[in-house]
């Protein structure tokens, strides 16, 4: 059952990522129709901006994420022996280098991981998590975060965030060009085409325009769908590492029962946390939820 869940989640992720790339190209094609009356120009623009932005995002250091979330590095075992030992042992079981260890001085129990590859991984936990969890529960949470690193989830989420940003940029470019009347040549060409093909070109233009306007919203929904799926996969992978679903279940129950929201959290970092720092109590995931409901995560773990 465990390995079936892992395989199913991996397949679903592949489909989501492929769909994401296709969606970006579709947005580019729509912008090409709106701006140049030629979808190929838009495809090239989307591909170039997308590749450049992804490269910049992937090259960004995880230290930036740690700084944004006020995380301080643990440089020696003596500073946090239980946390250090847990991270070290889970990394060893996962077969990856030991990630850097950080602590966020916040009373709300939570954790997150960064690093686009296992060699550049880092794990951060809040002070509240260390104070509230037993060691076997902490192992479940750390195994979950180690799984994110091992499964290259941070790289995937970075690409997804970059693609959402690219779509927003492309949409903004199109809207600005329309607003400032920079499409005069395109409109003239389109008018000539419409004389020959009736209202077909006008309909295509309107559909493309509506698609570009809605694209950032749709892209954000896809990004969060990917994030929710990777949380399920990390839970299953954590059980694979610890062989003890009860530890992770107990940790989720304790975190769910804690009503404190994180005092200082970067809005752009919400999706990387073990549990949503906004403390949503919904039982069903919404389109724009970065995490599946804790009740759903617990149910899946109990069925393993």
UniProtKB/Swiss-Prot annotation:
- Give the UniProt entry's GO cellular component terms: plasma membrane
Q: Where are the transmembrane segments?
A: 14-34, 39-59, 159-179, 202-222
The entry's family comment says: Belongs to the peptidase M48B family.
- Specify the species: Listeria monocytogenes serovar 1/2a (strain ATCC BAA-679 / EGD-e)
Where does this polypeptide localize?
Cell membrane
Q: Which residues form the active site?
A: 145
What keywords are assigned to this protein? Answer: Cell membrane, Hydrolase, Membrane, Metal-binding, Metalloprotease, Protease, Transmembrane, Transmembrane helix, Zinc
User: Does Glycoprotein appear among the keywords?
Assistant: no
* EC nos: 3.4.24.-
Q: How does it sit in the membrane?
A: Multi-pass membrane protein
Chief site of localization: membrane
Q: Name one GO molecular function term.
A: zinc ion binding
Q: Which InterPro entries match?
A: HtpX_protease (IPR050083), Pept_M48_protease_HtpX (IPR022919), Peptidase_M48 (IPR001915)
Q: Cofactor binding mode, per the note?
A: Binds 1 zinc ion per subunit.
Indicate which residues the UniProt annotation says bind Zn(2+). 144, 148, 231
Its BP terms in the Gene Ontology are: proteolysis
Q: Which cofactor does it need?
A: Zn(2+)
Q: What is this protein called?
A: Protease HtpX homolog
HAMAP family reported for this sequence: Pept_M48_protease_HtpX (MF_00188)
């Amino acid at each position: 059952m465990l390995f079936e869940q892992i395989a199913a989640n991996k397949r679903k992720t592949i489909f989501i990522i492929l769909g994401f790339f296709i969606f970006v190209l579709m947005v580019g094609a729509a912008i090409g129709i709106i701006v140049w009356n030629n979808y190929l120009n838009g495809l090239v623009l989307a591909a170039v901006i997308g590749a450049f932005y992804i490269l910049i995002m992937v090259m960004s250091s995880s230290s930036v994420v740690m700084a944004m979330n006020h995380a301080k590095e643990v440089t020696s075992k003596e500073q946090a022996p239980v946390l250090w030992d847990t991270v070290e042992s889970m990394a060893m079981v996962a077969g990856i280098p030991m990630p850097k260890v950080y602590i966020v001085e916040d009373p709300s129990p939570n954790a997150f991981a960064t690093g686009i590859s296992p060699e550049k991984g880092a794990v951060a936990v809040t002070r509240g998590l260390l104070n509230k969890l037993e060691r076997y529960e902490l192992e479940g949470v750390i195994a979950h975060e180690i799984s994110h690193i091992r499964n290259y989830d941070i790289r995937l989420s970075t690409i997804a965030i970059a693609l959402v940003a690219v779509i927003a940029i492309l949409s903004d470019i199109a809207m600005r060009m329309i607003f400032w009347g920079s499409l005069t040549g395109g409109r003239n060409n389109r008018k000539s085409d419409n004389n020959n093909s009736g209202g077909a070109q006008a309909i295509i233009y309107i559909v493309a325009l509506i698609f570009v306007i809605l694209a950032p919203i749709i892209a954000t929904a896809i990004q969060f769908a990917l994030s929710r799926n990777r949380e399920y996969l990390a839970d299953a992978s954590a059980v694979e590492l610890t062989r003890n679903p009860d530890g992770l279940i107990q940790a989720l129950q304790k975190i769910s029962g804690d009503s404190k929201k994180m005092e200082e959290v970067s809005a752009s970092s919400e999706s990387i946390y073990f549990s949503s720092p906004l403390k949503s109590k919904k039982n069903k995931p919404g389109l724009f939820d970065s995490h599946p409901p804790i009740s759903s995560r617990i149910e899946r773990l109990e069925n393993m």
